[in-house]
Amino acid sequence: MKLRKSLGQHMLVDRRVISRIVGYAELSEDDVVLEVGCGTGNLTSALLRKCSVVGIEKDPLMVKRLRERFSDFIGKGRFRLIQGDALKVDFPYFTKFVANIPYKISSPLTFKLLKTDFRLAVVMYQREFAERLCGEDNRLGVISKTYCKAEILEIVKPSSFNPPPKVESAIVRIVPEPEVFVENRELFEKFVTFAFSMRRKRMGKIVQEFRKRYGVELAVNKNLAEKRPEELGARKFAEIVVGE
């Protein structure tokens, strides 16, 4: 089957990697897995051996192939396939999220996931995105800490995919347990986004500029005032916002 680069299609074909992903998800028969970007169904097949699966696939050619390949599971109600854009369709009920997602939608899809109710997610990302998600020296990593705990489980080589991507990938486990609590999430995310848009400036100056732009007075102590955004981490950002 000819794959479409416009959809970022890189099919996971390494059975050992697929097996480890399923293992990381710690699935039971009672689980319902949501898989975004089912592709040709290699991961889907392994998931269906463990539990029920709901898949979301945008490519109509892939949808046709999936319906043919898993017609028995569909007939038994073990596999439900939704054709559509995962960023636009409402997520159905699920307990765990397991997917090799299209890398081009990593950020919006991850935040959509984090705002839903789930027990555990095991996601294949581009390595660079995974490192930002699990780090604290960037906007994505800082904000994500207020939603979840995320850790890289392993790095996956391009040869595990068809066609091979130009970059390495990473399997990430996400547990919906916030590492940092923030009461005013809207203000926190606005301030973090603003700060990292001015990452070369020090926090004292950034707080001043934020006040001028939005009329919000934030408190920053002398020590933090001399630091740049990538030096703070989620907890220090939260301390600044709490002091507003």
Curated annotation (Swiss-Prot):
S-adenosyl-L-methionine binds at H10, L12, G37, E57, D85, N100. It is an enzyme of class 2 (transferase). This is Probable ribosomal RNA small subunit methyltransferase A. InterPro entries: KsgA/Erm, rRNA_Ade_Mease_Trfase_CS, rRNA_Ade_methylase_Trfase_N, rRNA_adenine_dimethylase, SAM-dependent_MTases_sf. It comes from Archaeoglobus fulgidus (strain ATCC 49558 / DSM 4304 / JCM 9628 / NBRC 100126 / VC-16). Its main location: cytoplasm. GO terms for cellular component: cytoplasm. Signal peptide: none annotated. Keywords: Cytoplasm, Methyltransferase, RNA-binding, rRNA processing, S-adenosyl-L-methionine, Transferase. SMART domains: rADc. It is found in: Cytoplasm. SUPFAM superfamilies: S-adenosyl-L-methionine-dependent methyltransferases. Its EC number is 2.1.1.-.
